[in-house]
Amino acid sequence: MQISINELNFDDDSYQYMELLKQLTYIDPSIITNEMFEKQLSIIKNNPFHKIIVAKIDGKIVGSTTVLIEPKFIHNLSSVGHIEDVVVDQNYRLHGIGKLLIVKAIDICRQERCYKIILDCSDKVCGFYCKLGFTPKEKQMALYLNGK
């Protein structure tokens, strides 16, 4: 099984990508047109501190994560990396795809001189992230502005 890890691009299947995201959280691909998707992807790709990484097998998107870089004044003008929206298609889990995505995200954060990386996860996947060097820290807080 050949797995490729790359940034999400305009020639990737937008519907396939959104269907994958449905396994992570709420999204309704039926209301997002190709034009809307491309506009949003253009906004993301024009931001050098925002990267969507996808894993593909035979051209099919089977995993994804988002990396955000937050430039800081503290720690001698370094940055903080944020890993978000980690998802692997349920039919492809336990094949090392999640690990490949996180390793790529960590590499991006290193290249951007991040002094730490933050990610939020549920208790059931803490062990996975601990094996990759992450440690539980503090508590996460959230305020949902749209009620979801």
Curated annotation (Swiss-Prot):
Enumerate the UniProt keywords alphabetically. Acyltransferase, Transferase
- Cite the annotated pathway: Nucleotide-sugar biosynthesis; UDP-N-acetyl-alpha-D-glucosamine biosynthesis; N-acetyl-alpha-D-glucosamine 1-phosphate from alpha-D-glucosamine 6-phosphate (route I): step 1/2
Which EC numbers does the record give?
A: 2.3.1.4
Q: What class of enzyme is it?
A: transferase
Where is substrate bound in this sequence?
Answer: 25, 72-75, 84-86, 115-116, 120, 138
The record lists the catalysed reaction(s) as:
D-glucosamine 6-phosphate + acetyl-CoA = N-acetyl-D-glucosamine 6-phosphate + CoA + H(+)
- CDD domains registered for this protein in UniProt: NAT_SF
Pfam families membership: Acetyltransf_1 (PF00583)
- Quote the record's binding site residues for acetyl-CoA: 86-88, 94-99, 129-131
Protein name (database record)? Probable glucosamine 6-phosphate N-acetyltransferase
**What is the organism field in this record?**
Acanthamoeba polyphaga mimivirus
Q: What is the lineage of its organism?
A: Viruses, Varidnaviria, Bamfordvirae, Nucleocytoviricota, Megaviricetes
